[in-house]
């Protein structure tokens, strides 16, 4: 039994790591496809990930101690068992069961050949359940997928983990193909019994009103990451262009650090204006990050009427955030680096910056637990993020084309 428990323990240990790296693409796919993240759907898909990792580890573990694992040079067919139903003869050969004594049948659960066959059936039962319950596949598709999954497992073993090991360290067994496929079919058959205790997947999005949903900070944070990657790249490119142009005009190759800081600040101001104010005016309040996460900025008038965003709305929104808050913090950092202040002034400025960061941090933490998720620069500018509805996406794509 330990040979089966060990891979599952490894799967449980590595699952959080895999989940961490897959969370960002998972969220993006959910936002793009459904417009929001359904917690129950997330639970299903993460449980599917855990099952897939467990099944894969059960197939490949334990690994040989050495990649040079060939004891003798044999033909590939030496590592293949191609006679169907060999597991039956192996079970009958090893068993201590007396068929006329039903009480002796319990011995089967202690015998290697029977347990191995049973394991191969159980290995793919969850796959059949997922296929029918969540992916809503029919019997034929479940059969083909289960067979394909089993073939993938067997080829993984036959190729020595895709060539990492010189020789296969487990047999390619035709019985495993049959038993794994049977497991998938059993999973398909028992799904209605299990589904009676679970929500219907076709109803997960039934009562969802995207137009009334609040855009959360995780979603906005993902958009922020993509947008600021672009901002950083664009600012660097523009800074190099301006620096090169300045060097030509001044006929020098030595631009001082102070001049470079001015050029970087100038480039940042221009990029912010183009990316966050000019482009969203044309794209209906969308930047690349917002498009990826399926949100856009709208004007939220005091009368409660939502309107399309204008250039001046965007200027108020992003000038306050980037030129105001971020600009003030950058100015203090610039003074600290280039101001040549006395020691007491440096300490005072450091304290001011620390208080500034603390106040902002506390403010964002407080807003995190508030219902409306509206930040100060949005209140002042009368703007906010909303989820882009499917028809709005289609209209925007049609207009763009």
Model-based region annotation:
Residues 171-182:
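Individual transmembrane alpha-helices with interfacial aromatic-anchor signatures
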Residues 1-168, 185-289, 299-401:
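Bulky hydrophobic segments
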């Amino acid at each position: 039994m330990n040979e089966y428990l060990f891979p599952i323990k490894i799967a449980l240990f590595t699952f959080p790591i895999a989940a961490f790296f897959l969370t960002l693409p998972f969220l993006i796919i959910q936002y793009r496809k459904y417009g929001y993240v359904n917690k129950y759907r997330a639970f299903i898909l993460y449980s599917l990930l855990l099952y897939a990792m467990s099944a894969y580890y059960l197939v490949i573990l334990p690994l040989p101690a050495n990649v040079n694992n060939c004891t003798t040079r044999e033909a590939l067919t030496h590592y293949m068992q191609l006679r169907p139903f060999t597991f039956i003869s192996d079970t009958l050969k090893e068993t201590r069961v007396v068929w006329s004594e039903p009480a002796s049948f319990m011995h089967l659960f202690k015998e290697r050949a029977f347990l191995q066959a049973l394991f191969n059936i159980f290995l793919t039962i969850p796959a059949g359940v997922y296929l029918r319950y969540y992916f809503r596949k029919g019997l034929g598709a479940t059969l083909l997928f289960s067979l394909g999954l089993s073939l993938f497992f067997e080829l993984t073993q036959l190729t020595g983990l895709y060539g990492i090991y010189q020789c296969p360290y487990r047999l390619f067994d035709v019985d495993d193909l049959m038993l794994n496929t049977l497991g998938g079919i059993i999973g398909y058959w028992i799904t209605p019994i299990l589904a009676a205790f679970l929500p219907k997947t076709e109803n997960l999005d039934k009562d969802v009103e995207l137009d009334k949903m609040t855009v959360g900070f995780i979603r906005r944070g993902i958009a922020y990451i993509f947008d600021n990657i672009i901002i950083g790249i664009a600012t660097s490119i523009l800074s190099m262009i301006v620096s090169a142009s300045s060097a030509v005009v001044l006929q020098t190759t030595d631009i001082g650090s102070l001049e470079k800081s001015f050029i970087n600040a100038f480039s940042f101001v221009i990029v912010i204006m183009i990316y966050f104010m000019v482009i969203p005016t044309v794209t209906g309040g969308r930047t690349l990050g917002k498009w990826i996460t399926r949100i856009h900025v709208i004007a939220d008038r005091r009368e409660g009427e939502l309107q399309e965003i204008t250039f001046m709305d965007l200027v108020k929104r992003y000038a306050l955030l980037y030129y105001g808050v971020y600009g003030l913090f950058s100015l203090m950092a610039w003074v600290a680096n280039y101001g040549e202040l006395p020691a007491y002034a440096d300490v005072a400025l450091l304290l001011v910056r620390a208080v500034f960061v603390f106040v902002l941090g506390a403010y964002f933490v407080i807003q995190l637990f508030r219902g409306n998720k509206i930040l100060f620069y949005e209140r002042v500018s009368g703007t906010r993020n909303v989820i882009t509805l499917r028809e709005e996406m289609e209209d925007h794509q049609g207009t763009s084309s």
